[in-house]
Amino acid sequence: MLNRRQLLAAGAAGLALPGIARAQQTPGVTATELRIGCTMPFSGPASAYGVIGRSHEAFFKMVNEKGGIAGRKINFIAYDDGYSPPKTVEQVRRLVEQDRVAFLFNTLGTPTNSAIVRYVNARRVPHIFLSTGADKWGEFKEHPWTIGWQPSYRTEAQIYMKHLLEQNPNPRIGLLYQNDDFGKDYVIGVRDVLKERFDQVVRLVSHEVTDPTVDSQIVSLHNAGCDVMVTATTPKFAAQTIRRVFDIGWRPAFHFLTNVSISVGTVMEPAGPEKGVGIITSAYLKDPTDPAWDNDAGMNQWRAFMRENIPNGDLKDGSYPFAFGVVNTLMHVLQKCDGNFSRENVMKQVADIRDLEVPTLLPGIRVNTSPTNFHPIRQMQLQRWDGRTWRRFGGVIEGANV
């Protein structure tokens, strides 16, 4: 029979020992290291996004130089998947089975993440803050170890259609979409709003990520008499679309562009800034080219990070503020873990974010999650290209499936 003093001693030991055990039992977690895995398109058709991974590398290096997190240095392992789903599967298996990472962070792409989601959930590996806006990443019952970060493409498309119908109740819409889950979410969002009118007013054309150009698709929509253009594709093809629409003399009354392809440096300037005047998109991040943020505290924090850690980075490239926003969200979660980096606790903290303000998010937009809300950002604001920068208009629009 244990006396009170022995019981207290046993209780103290019980509190201490599991923490040590967790560090030993959780893959990628030791007393001195936290291993985090990621796949990125450092090459291939979506390589413009590769700077996101490079930004993360620089950020974690900075964190380590300042002492790490909970006494541990972060070992960030990022592999190139070339935006190829079979390659993603190969690289993620390598990360999980050979590198034994604690979790996957910000893996990029809808088709690529779709190829690994069953595998990582079967392995119970946190697959968090994906760099993709597919609506399905919010399906917490279907894959409880996976969560996105940015607003979903479906919600974005719904916002565009609601705005369009307020301005033009009888549009003839040409919708160019990438033939994968990413592009199809926009089709679903447009259909959500138009309902039974969809087939009457929408002309659909798709393209493969391996296609060299989308010129023929643009000509097809123009010849069909569409007066509204919706472009749901990645940066390379978005730049081609803007340029081709202008060059053939097509002037749609409205041109909506997915917000994953609005970088000034990688889309608008290559397309020709004057060729995109009037294009409407949505935003949840501060635009690094907008003078409105020249003296903004959050953007000054990001610019200081860039100067010190990525001095040759393009300050016009919106992928960098995106990376800074999502990695700051991760750091918030890791701090909430309070040294317990078990996979279960990581997911517990991921699903308990309340009104988090992130330096590069627009004013009024906050990160929120719960065990039944795996859509961390559900607010957006419309903006229009004026030939030099994106100009926001209207208020912040809130809610998943608006």
Can you annotate each of these PLM segments?
Residues R100-L108, I128-L130, G174-L176, C226-P235, ...:
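Periplasmic-binding protein-like
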